[in-house]
Amino acid sequence: MALATEPADLTKERLMDAAEGLFAEYGIEAVSARQIALAAGQRNQSAIRYHFGSKDDLVAALHAQRITEINERRAELLDAPGVASDMRALIGAIATPLAERVERDAGGSAYVRFLAHLFSDRQRRDLLIEHGESAALLRRIYADLRRLASAIPEPLFSERLRLLVGGIIHALADRERLRAKGGAGPFVLGQAAFVNNLIDAGIGILTAPPSPATLAHLASPKEHARGTNG
């Protein structure tokens, strides 16, 4: 149990670690501030309010801290020669830092599962792109991919990119959930092949020609009105 004299920074770290594990397992909405405090060994049930302000503030702080390392690796990949003209490398810059984080230590598994819950929460999803460095890197990736997939009209491209990013996050998270429940699970592919296959699938998502049916719906004023409303 955490000591009353424990430094504030260490207490905050304990709270974030506990929150990440609980969010990964049960989802963000299902976990209370009280549960997080107890899991972190805090006797004071208002520890979240004292150190962060609210549970939402804790979620934001947790994501901001964890994404820093991901962003550093992503920037490194994007700065490699020729990446701006290589769709596979650009999609790899989305997937690879997350996959590497998962493989490096057990905390990476909890992080990617937490990230999947965050991405699925429409009200919190903007946290994924509002972090300053994240926003700049994602704009850079978007611009390069948009240029390379110029044959795909809007809003199809933006929707496909959202599906691509969500698919990568959820595929990694689902794999980690299987691992967490006991061993390797029914995995056909090793981790490296799994990630490369994700990237291959991403290329297909972004470049597959839209069908006449999709284009017809895209041209329908009724379809645009429905999309605007939700």
Task: Describe the role of every protein-language-model region.
Residues 135-230:
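C-terminal peripheral helix-coil segments that are non-catalytic and often amphipathic
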Residues 12-17, 52-75, 79:
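An amphipathic alpha-helix adjacent to DNA-recognition modules
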Residues 75-111, 161:
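Hydrophobic alpha-helical connector segments
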Residues 15-23, 202:
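Short hydrophobic clusters on alpha-helical segments that form packing/core surfaces
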